[in-house]
């Protein structure tokens, strides 16, 4: 029993211990399970986070790969499009090239057809011309046949007439016929000789003028109507004016020159149209400035002194010019007259330098023609001497020059040259003509005389506008400093007969609308051209 109880107790104890052990183990297992669960949860969280990271990485990688693939696809598409476009362009280019070649062939074929058409037209014209020529020749042959028959009848009649003539009458008839034939031949030869002489004369004259102009180089300074005098300082202006202007009034009254004192620093201007009086005033003013004594009495003294000095300078100018031109044995009065031309101007051109140049040109021309060179130079030098005193003596400078040339026993050729160089009388020597030509060369070229460039250009422009104002005028050109207008007309509008009428109309309009020195030559040219090509 006890054993049973012990057994039962032992069993109970074993149960209790087993339960306790089992509880402990269950608790440990639970704790282990919880720990395992926690670990599993942590691992799950870690795995989930890692999975999310991996998923994000995979997503980004996929995006990058997708973007790269898209770019690659885009590049491939662009490359294919480029290749396709190039293929299309190449096809278009080849088609355009073919079209261009086709157009070129068509143009060449058209040109060939045009040329053939022109050739056919020209051949047709040639055939028409030949046909017309044959017709004309046939008519001409018929006319000549009629003339031959008529001549045969006339000769027959003449023979019948001669048969009835005496020997003297027959001789007279033969001489008359011979004279008529010779008269016609002589007239033809005379006309040909005159034409040849005229052509050679014109060419020789041009050559002579060209040689003369090339061998002479003149120097010119444009003359003015004012002279500037430089002062050491502006204080000198007050001394020149003087108290209440008495000094300047004295100088102006004694010299006849306007003394202009303005704001221009250290300059006094002398204005006057008489170069001699202006030069005397300049010399006087410079002497007053150098001397320092400026008052009316001193001014009168210096003016008189400089007048005498001016006479000596005039004589020196005349002697130097006479020596330069090679004109010895000139009368002293003529030397003084020529010296006065140093202070005489004509349209701004110094007359003494002009006279020297005319003398040299006339001498060159005379030498080329075998004339008296010394006489030609002397005549050219003296041709304008009347201008030195034409303001003091009544009459033109030509009349005054003739009178003084006769008075001082100059050569008759010199007298006639002075009288004829402006066309007042007819020249009676070759030298007179040469001096007139030299005078025109020296004075009429552009720039020798003071015609402003603006007026000069305007005159040429007006001359050309007058010519082009007529219907049928193609071009017009003003030549030789406005001394010739050359007009080119349209041949389809202006006939040969109308050319003459046009030249007269242009001449009349120029005379009515322009002011000009000398003469203007109007030349109208009508030119017809025919151009063809040999194939």
From Swiss-Prot:
It is an enzyme of class 3 (hydrolase). GO terms for biological process: mRNA catabolic process. PROSITE patterns: HD, KH_TYPE_1. The keyword Protein biosynthesis does not apply. Keywords: Cell membrane, Endonuclease, Hydrolase, Membrane, Nuclease, RNA-binding, Transmembrane, Transmembrane helix. It is found in: Cell membrane. Residues 225-285 form the KH domain. Residues 351-444 form the HD domain. It is a single-pass membrane protein. The chain crosses the membrane at residues 4-24. Its EC number is 3.1.-.-. It comes from the Bacteria. The keyword Methyltransferase does not apply. Its main location: membrane. InterPro entries: HD/PDEase_dom (IPR003607), HD_domain (IPR006674), HDIG_dom (IPR006675), KH_dom (IPR004087), KH_dom_type_1 (IPR004088), KH_dom_type_1_sf (IPR036612), Ribonuclease_Y (IPR017705), RNase_Y_N (IPR022711). One of its GO terms (molecular function) is RNA endonuclease activity. Residues 118-141 are annotated as: Disordered. One of its GO terms (cellular component) is plasma membrane. It holds the Pfam family KH_1. Belongs to the RNase Y family. Endoribonuclease that initiates mRNA decay. This is Ribonuclease Y. It comes from Streptococcus pyogenes serotype M1. The gene is rny.
